[in-house]
Amino acid sequence: MNIDNELSKCRNIGIMAHIDAGKTTTTERILFYTGKQNRIGEVHEGAASMDWMEQEKERGITITSAATTCFWNGHRINIIDTPGHVDFTIEVERSLRVLDGAVAVFDGVAGVEPQSETVWRQADKYNVPRICFMNKMDRMGADFYRCVDMLVDRLGATPLVLQLPIGSEKDFVGVVDLLEMRSIIWDEDSLGASFHYGEIPKDMIDKAQEYRNKLLESAVELNDEAMNLYFEGKEISVSLLKSCIRTGVIQSKFVPVLCGSAFKNRGVQPLLDAVVDFLPAPNDIPVIEALDVKTSNTINVKTSAGGKFVALAFKVMTDKFVGSLTFIRIYSGKLSSKTTVLNAVKDSTESIGRILLMHANNREDITEAQAGDIVALAGLKKTVTGDTLCALDYPVILERMEFPEPVMEIAVEPKSTADQEKMGIALSRLVAEDPSLGMYVNPESGQTILKGMGELHLEVIVDRMRREFNVEANIGAPQVAYRETITKSVEIEYIHKKQTGGAGQFAKVNILFEPLPPGSGFQFESKITGGAIPKEYIPGVQSGLENIRGSGMLAGFPVIDFKATLFDGAFHEVDSSPLAFELAAKGAFRDMVNKAGAILLEPIMKVEIITPDEYMGDVIGDINSRRGRVAEMQDRHNTKVILAFIPLAKMFGYVKDLRSMSQGRAQYSMYFSCYEQVPDNIVANEIKTK
């Protein structure tokens, strides 16, 4: 078989959704029906094969993205099952970066939930084509048509409905296939493995024809032949219609919508058909952009197994049997064991030992992998998440991933001297695995501080230290990761001069500091012309600003959302050095503090609360007492859905308070929204200087 024909038979997909929408249950059914496993693992029994960590089995949630491979209709499908909890959103981010397509799973009752919006935006960022699966159609309150409307209202998506549910809630038995215009009914006694086709129920014929017409109108626009047949009133073949839909999905014109109940074993096989029929193969995305290290130009890397080897490392983890495992997605060329490749980011080489295909935490050794493959490499020494591996004679760097800022901190202290050394090793490995986890030592207290995405994230990290590394630690109360920024533009001229008898130090910098929109981070630009400062000294200025902004201006918190433009300066032939310019930059930063209107920022969380009507007044009153603001209220069956924005500082222990207010009947979910200024009247009470 031609190599690129093999590529066309490959699908790299992710399963993504809000927590409890049924991602892992859907994946377990896929593995069962494709013959990858001979039994169905249930999440609620702690037996799901994709949830292999002890914490995942105990909590019934997915924490780490797990990879596996299965086969369907002659196609190989590489699947990554990702977490739905906001605290583990980094796992979704790095998975979507290397996937060609995604299946977005929605709860048929709740529809589009907060984390659904987050993962949808992440998929938009990486232009990942996707299909939607409306799950849990058997549950009380499930409403397929309302969920489709929510795709438009909440996500701005263009849904292309391919199926309609037959029956609702406990009477849900199958679907109407709008492509073939027939019904599909699943047999109860075969665990969903067998099903039969039939006529569309009479009471659904009109609705099926209505949605079939909508489907045709959207799909034929992408193919002249299909459009001509449509306007001539002639029949369009299913194969031509599928080709139109595939084109539209790959171009992100619309998202096909299917439905079912993974737990009740209905709807999964047509979902697999849709993955094969509509989601792109690696070679459907013909080129990816990369930076040519030699020329610093942007070049296109062709997606082909016949090209030079190029891969992106998207995850590092520690395996207790194999040691360090680095997951890579190969975009071009082939990789064989016992060869040497270049890490273009680190400008160092890595020796390739074992190449592994993963099924959750089970491993299969292979000797070669090629473009389109997602594999794990054992024993790499220097490669971390986001690094590019490539052929020795083809140094290129692929676009790196963006990782969210940690919003919560805890102090971690080893319980004994024996735990001290082990804790250092454990934390360095865990931080290497998880780019959304940070660590630093408080210079005043000497405490080790862990930074993470939320209480659950940090709780799981501490639990992993204990289980995997035998480290016992005392944990401090969670603290908010505040930030600082500036509100005014200011130009600073600073001269650093030091004379000590021998060679001295001299550097002069003129820097414009400007505030940037929220979420911009720190930006540095040099506008030096005419040799006012030699090129080799400019990185010292950037380094100095990077270092000092981390220790803050007001209360010791990192400074974000500002730009520093180096526009002039001076140097001395003998006394200037990179260090002198680094110190000058730090001096300029300190001078800027009192002139640029420095303020404190706090993380604001987007919170969705679902509560019975009778508790709504208490819940809203409590939101107001937490300095929160209610943005939206909706009716959902017999409950109220409240969307609010609340400072993270006021959310500690909220789960207990909400249970108490509602007698355990209300629930909530939250995720990071943005940083906002801390009101002046509460700064002194809420912030303690580091």
UniProtKB/Swiss-Prot annotation:
<dbReference type="Pfam" id="PF03764">
    <property type="entry name" value="EFG_IV"/>
</dbReference>
<dbReference type="InterPro" id="IPR047872">
    <property type="entry name" value="EFG_IV"/>
</dbReference>
<keyword id="KW-0251">Elongation factor</keyword>
<dbReference type="GO" id="GO:0003924">
    <property type="term" value="F:GTPase activity"/>
</dbReference>
<feature type="domain" description="tr-type G">
    <location>
        <begin position="8"/>
        <end position="283"/>
    </location>
</feature>
<feature type="binding site">
    <location>
        <begin position="81"/>
        <end position="85"/>
    </location>
    <ligand>
        <name>GTP</name>
    </ligand>
</feature>
<dbReference type="InterPro" id="IPR005225">
    <property type="entry name" value="Small_GTP-bd"/>
</dbReference>
<dbReference type="InterPro" id="IPR053905">
    <property type="entry name" value="EF-G-like_DII"/>
</dbReference>
<dbReference type="GO" id="GO:0005737">
    <property type="term" value="C:cytoplasm"/>
</dbReference>
<dbReference type="InterPro" id="IPR009000">
    <property type="entry name" value="Transl_B-barrel_sf"/>
</dbReference>
<keyword id="KW-0648">Protein biosynthesis</keyword>
<dbReference type="InterPro" id="IPR035647">
    <property type="entry name" value="EFG_III/V"/>
</dbReference>
<keyword id="KW-0547">Nucleotide-binding</keyword>
<keyword id="KW-0963">Cytoplasm</keyword>
<feature type="binding site">
    <location>
        <begin position="135"/>
        <end position="138"/>
    </location>
    <ligand>
        <name>GTP</name>
    </ligand>
</feature>
<dbReference type="InterPro" id="IPR005517">
    <property type="entry name" value="Transl_elong_EFG/EF2_IV"/>
</dbReference>
<dbReference type="GO" id="GO:0003746">
    <property type="term" value="F:translation elongation factor activity"/>
</dbReference>
<dbReference type="InterPro" id="IPR041095">
    <property type="entry name" value="EFG_II"/>
</dbReference>
<dbReference type="Pfam" id="PF00679">
    <property type="entry name" value="EFG_C"/>
</dbReference>
<feature type="binding site">
    <location>
        <begin position="17"/>
        <end position="24"/>
    </location>
    <ligand>
        <name>GTP</name>
    </ligand>
</feature>
<keyword id="KW-0342">GTP-binding</keyword>
<protein>
    <recommendedName>
        <fullName>Elongation factor G</fullName>
    </recommendedName>
</protein>
<dbReference type="GO" id="GO:0005525">
    <property type="term" value="F:GTP binding"/>
</dbReference>
<dbReference type="InterPro" id="IPR014721">
    <property type="entry name" value="Ribsml_uS5_D2-typ_fold_subgr"/>
</dbReference>
<dbReference type="InterPro" id="IPR000640">
    <property type="entry name" value="EFG_V-like"/>
</dbReference>
<dbReference type="InterPro" id="IPR009022">
    <property type="entry name" value="EFG_III"/>
</dbReference>
<dbReference type="InterPro" id="IPR027417">
    <property type="entry name" value="P-loop_NTPase"/>
</dbReference>
<dbReference type="Pfam" id="PF14492">
    <property type="entry name" value="EFG_III"/>
</dbReference>
<dbReference type="GO" id="GO:0032790">
    <property type="term" value="P:ribosome disassembly"/>
</dbReference>
<dbReference type="InterPro" id="IPR020568">
    <property type="entry name" value="Ribosomal_Su5_D2-typ_SF"/>
</dbReference>
<dbReference type="InterPro" id="IPR000795">
    <property type="entry name" value="T_Tr_GTP-bd_dom"/>
</dbReference>
<dbReference type="Pfam" id="PF22042">
    <property type="entry name" value="EF-G_D2"/>
</dbReference>
<dbReference type="InterPro" id="IPR004540">
    <property type="entry name" value="Transl_elong_EFG/EF2"/>
</dbReference>
<comment type="function">
    <text>Catalyzes the GTP-dependent ribosomal translocation step during translation elongation. During this step, the ribosome changes from the pre-translocational (PRE) to the post-translocational (POST) state as the newly formed A-site-bound peptidyl-tRNA and P-site-bound deacylated tRNA move to the P and E sites, respectively. Catalyzes the coordinated movement of the two tRNA molecules, the mRNA and conformational changes in the ribosome.</text>
</comment>
<dbReference type="InterPro" id="IPR035649">
    <property type="entry name" value="EFG_V"/>
</dbReference>
<dbReference type="Pfam" id="PF00009">
    <property type="entry name" value="GTP_EFTU"/>
</dbReference>
<dbReference type="InterPro" id="IPR031157">
    <property type="entry name" value="G_TR_CS"/>
</dbReference>
<comment type="similarity">
    <text>Belongs to the TRAFAC class translation factor GTPase superfamily. Classic translation factor GTPase family. EF-G/EF-2 subfamily.</text>
</comment>
